[in-house]
């Protein structure tokens, strides 16, 4: 199978390395200098340093070349750009006049200005594209790059997309499950990043494991309420892309969103934290969208609201936690 991976950040690079072990894989990025470095060293020293990439993996900075590769009869196109760049990439794909027949995206979050999920952006920008879906689940790029075990879910209303994604990714240490709840999978992948900031704050303040467990459990309830209101199914949020991804992102030391929370609790400013990370922390980008959607649906999401207060309203982390503890008692 031919596979084109659009986006050479940490996640796109790790997935391309996995795919290249079994398929004819091409990794694209618009940054020619990044591509030149990949071609010379077979390592993404900018985003995934120390991980050797397969010799068979190919690289190109020409989007037309990548799209032609991913549009072959027996091919799959993987969109690994962040949500913030998804619409622009779709524009470029449409302008290139070569939209692959089968597309799966791996980005997580809501579009900041519109509060749309990735599938809604793709439907608006690539209206004729019918075989598409989302691949998501509890996964750190570095561990995938190291070929450590991982389980992900592909969700699509197209059986052809599910089957092609399964055929592409299900090998080696990667196990793929299938489903059709695109909205539920996307909401889980977006909201868990916001909740991971909350657990990072709690852990950074030294509030203990009991508090962490409470935040994860009550955060899952918030995720599920919003997801169901937006059209997802409740059972999706207890699976890999909901609870599984939340546990990993909220507790794993490789989590950028958890790191943001830890650093906020230590008294660092958000600008300083993001500057030092050098990578995207999607929980920061989509926190306001999550809260806006919750309010539009008349849904209470007190943990997400507390995170927004710390990120954008100048509320001290300890005061935000105190506010959560002062909430009225109620039935679970």
From Swiss-Prot:
The active site is at residue 192. Belongs to the NAD-dependent glycerol-3-phosphate dehydrogenase family. It is an enzyme of class 1 (oxidoreductase). Pfam families: NAD_Gly3P_dh_C (PF07479), NAD_Gly3P_dh_N (PF01210). It catalyses: sn-glycerol 3-phosphate + NAD(+) = dihydroxyacetone phosphate + NADH + H(+); sn-glycerol 3-phosphate + NADP(+) = dihydroxyacetone phosphate + NADPH + H(+). Keywords: Cytoplasm, Lipid biosynthesis, Lipid metabolism, NAD, NADP, Nucleotide-binding, Oxidoreductase, Phospholipid biosynthesis, Phospholipid metabolism. The keyword Transmembrane helix does not apply. Its EC number is 1.1.1.94. Gene3D superfamilies: N-(1-d-carboxylethyl)-l-norvaline Dehydrogenase, domain 2, NAD(P)-binding Rossmann-like Domain. Pathway: Membrane lipid metabolism; glycerophospholipid metabolism. Catalyzes the reduction of the glycolytic intermediate dihydroxyacetone phosphate (DHAP) to sn-glycerol 3-phosphate (G3P), the key precursor for phospholipid synthesis. It is found in: Cytoplasm. GO terms for molecular function: glycerol-3-phosphate dehydrogenase [NAD(P)+] activity; NAD binding. NADPH binds at residues 11, 30, 108, 141, 256, 280, 282. Sn-glycerol 3-phosphate binds at residues 108, 137, 139, 192, 245, 255-257. GO terms for cellular component: cytosol. Its main location: cytoplasm. This is Glycerol-3-phosphate dehydrogenase [NAD(P)+]. It comes from Burkholderia cenocepacia (strain ATCC BAA-245 / DSM 16553 / LMG 16656 / NCTC 13227 / J2315 / CF5610). One of its GO terms (biological process) is carbohydrate metabolic process.
